[in-house]
Amino acid sequence: MSARQPAIADTALVTAIDAVIEAGRRSAERGWVPATSGNFSVRVDAERIAVTRSGVDKGRLTPNDVLCQQLSQPLVAGSSAEAELHRRLYADDAEIGAVFHTHAVSATVLAQLHRGERLLTLSGWELQKALAGIRSHETVVEVPVVANDQDVVALANEVAARLAAPVAAGAVRAPGYLIAGHGLYAWGHTAVDAFRHLEALDVLFTQILTLRRHAS
């Protein structure tokens, strides 16, 4: 059942659906979600999220392409398997209000390059101050990298373990993680925050790849 079919008008749900559609459109404009890839979700309330269904063009989303998912329940029919990664993030952190996943080239390639280290470190970039809690370009920002896994429950458990682990002394964890050869998950307290993090991380990753090309 689509999220636009509640028996009673649900303003919070409608607002979340609209935010999901907007995030999908803006990401498609930037070329981050080719060939129906990626998925987007926004928290409705403590118990529910609005999340994109499987196999739809994220640049042309309609309300019927967005599902209402109870955090405590199995994935609803039509869900992407990756909706479990969204559900787990919300369930583990009540401060997360939106989660956006893209297949941008910069994120996918860097994640593959750092698969062995299982970590990408950012430092020295002014734009990293666009990430919540970062006040200086000198701050060391850690972005976890996990191996891709078609067992999404196992992948969600791996991500949860990585996010629960301590960062290095003096470092700060980014509001996102990378899946090797797959892409980026970024989140924020609101949909606006999550998209800012998504955009900032994409540019930061592009800057790193550009620097490496010139340094080689």
From Swiss-Prot:
Residues holding Zn(2+): 101, 103
Note on how the cofactor is bound: Binds 1 zinc ion per subunit.
Disulfide topology: none
Superkingdom: Bacteria
Biological process according to GO: L-methionine salvage from methylthioadenosine; pentose catabolic process
Assigned keywords, A-Z: Amino-acid biosynthesis, Lyase, Metal-binding, Methionine biosynthesis, Zinc
CC terms in the record's Gene Ontology section: cytosol
Enzyme Commission number(s) from the entry: 4.2.1.109
Biological pathway: Amino-acid biosynthesis; L-methionine biosynthesis via salvage pathway; L-methionine from S-methyl-5-thio-alpha-D-ribose 1-phosphate: step 2/6
Free-text function comment from the UniProt entry: Catalyzes the dehydration of methylthioribulose-1-phosphate (MTRu-1-P) into 2,3-diketo-5-methylthiopentyl-1-phosphate (DK-MTP-1-P).
Similarity comment text for this entry: Belongs to the aldolase class II family. MtnB subfamily.
Protein's name according to its UniProt entry: Methylthioribulose-1-phosphate dehydratase
Species this protein is from: Bradyrhizobium sp. (strain BTAi1 / ATCC BAA-1182)
